[in-house]
């Protein structure tokens, strides 16, 4: 059953690793979108958040201080949900629905990241297929 924990980590972090890479590959477009929705300091925020989710995703995936990695992901997705996907501000019904789905996706990812954080903290040294134990 050890493989189940590894597969769960792979599936969970795919979105963070691919999005983290996109923060750099599509930096200008992401900065423009962040500015359009009113995110603070998109010129700094996009690359920093890209680094945050790329590193956090790799930490969870590899099991290198997975608790810290999961915490980084958690600290990313909640503000992003509130700032980037504020569906309650949308007047167009289709845009409101799209942003609500994205908001709820991020809230769900926050729950998953929090669960991984707890798992790494509580059982870190006993977890299979990890490189290090927890940092916290």
Go through the PLM ranges and name each one:
Residues 33-39:
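Interfacial loop at the N-terminal end of multi-pass membrane proteins
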